[in-house]
Design a protein with these regions (language model features):
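Domain-level signal for soluble alpha/beta catalytic cores
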Residues: 1-361
Length: 361
């Protein structure tokens, strides 16, 4: 029997901002809209997004990242010890257009407030539906927060400090009733791919070493914390199709990841191109794998039959009840999809999930 609490109809928290919110952000930057006006626009956008997600039947609802100016702002805005913006560097070059705004860790890192407490509170004010909150993983932020040429020890220390901060935030979110937290780290997706590992080497990076170092930080979020029974904490490695998976996965980095990753839920890419599908054979039994089946970059809808065949292929390698279905990453404004196109993509995920699990969801 399917487990309702495995959240088979999945997504990645990030959604395409509505036109009204995009216009409000632009007006705020021009000084034509005050902070209160921007918050009102964010509140309206989140309320609309929650309603849409509920109608789509998604297992948990998010705020779409509509309150965040950039992917790492949840950390940068609430943690002291970050300095100026960093430009360039090997990791940023590997990520390419996917690289977020980065700031250098220059001093002791300490939380000055809750990272996502305001987001959780605002969601709880508009719905009693299960909530999804996404945070950047400590390993990801650490790799992006050290200037070029700094020793790996600096990255490890930064990762450990961030793991403690983010771990406390995850525990606080779980305690106040958030059902599902995703730690977002697309750098894994680049490093695990054969083409990405090759490009990393060209940039002077050792892919397996980076994977090990990030896992040490990300795994530390779990240290000494007991979560509620039906709380989910997952690791999201998806890149939204940005990583080149045409040559499959790199054996060394993949083995390092599969052997050490401690999470009970991971989000991976599982495209139509067979060699680009995340290898499921090495996944630890009992881990729920959320398959990224629907592309967030293209407006064209995938074939239902073709997606079903991919799920069937995955189910031949692992228990189908340990599979969830999703897109291949979060939706963003940069992807260029309209709100209607986004809804159709998510509706496709929901439709296929109900084909497999039906009324059990």
């Amino acid at each position: 029997m399917a487990d309702d609490f495995k959240y088979h109809i999945d997504h990645h928290a990030g959604l395409t901002p509505q036109i009204a919110l995009t216009e409000a952000r632009a007006a705020h930057l021009r000084g034509e809209l005050d902070d209160a006006g921007l918050r009102a626009a964010q509140d309206a956008a989140v309320a609309e997004a929650v309603s849409t997600q509920r109608r789509l039947g998604l297992a948990a609802v998010s705020d779409g990242w509509f309150r965040r100016p950039d992917p790492l702002s949840a950390v940068h805005d609430q943690v002291s010890g970050f300095g100026d913006e960093l430009v360039g560097g090997a990791v940023a070059e590997l990520l390419g257009a996917s690289a977020p705004r980065r700031r250098e860790a220059v001093g002791p890192l300490a939380a000055t407030g809750r990272l996502a407490g305001h987001e959780s509170a605002a969601l709880r004010a508009v719905t009693e539906y299960p909530l999804l909150v996404s945070l950047p993983s400590p390993g990801y932020v650490a790799e992006l927060s050290v200037a070029e040429g700094q020793q790996s020890k600096s990255v490890e220390e930064t990762g450990a400090a961030l793991a403690a901060i983010i771990g406390r935030e995850v525990a606080a979110l779980a305690a106040e009733g958030v059902a599902y937290v995703l730690l977002h780290n697309p750098l894994y997706g680049f490093l695990l791919s054969a083409r990405g590992a090759e490009r990393a080497a060209e940039l002077g990076l050792e892919a397996a070493e980076l994977v090990d170092r990030m896992l040490a930080a990300d795994a530390a979020v779990l240290d000494g914390v007991e979560y509620p029974v039906h709380f989910h904490l997952g690791l999201d490695l998806t890149t939204g199709g940005a990583a080149d998976l045409s040559d499959g996965y790199a054996a060394g980095p993949l083995a390092a990841f599969q052997e050490r990753q401690p999470f009970d839920r991971i989000c991976v890419e599982y495209p139509a191109l067979e060699q680009g599908r995340f290898p499921l054979a090495g996944v630890r039994p009992g881990v729920v794998v959320s398959l990224g089946l629907v592309d967030v970059r293209t407006p064209e809808l995938e074939s239902v039959d073709e997606i079903v065949s991919r799920v069937d292929a995955a189910a031949a390698e692992m228990d189908i009840d340990d599979i969830a279905l999703s897109t291949n990453g979060p939706f963003t404004a940069e992807n260029g999809l309209t709100g209607h196109q986004e809804r159709l993509k998510l509706q496709l995920v929901e439709m296929v999930a109900r084909y497999f699990w039906g009324n059990e969801l």
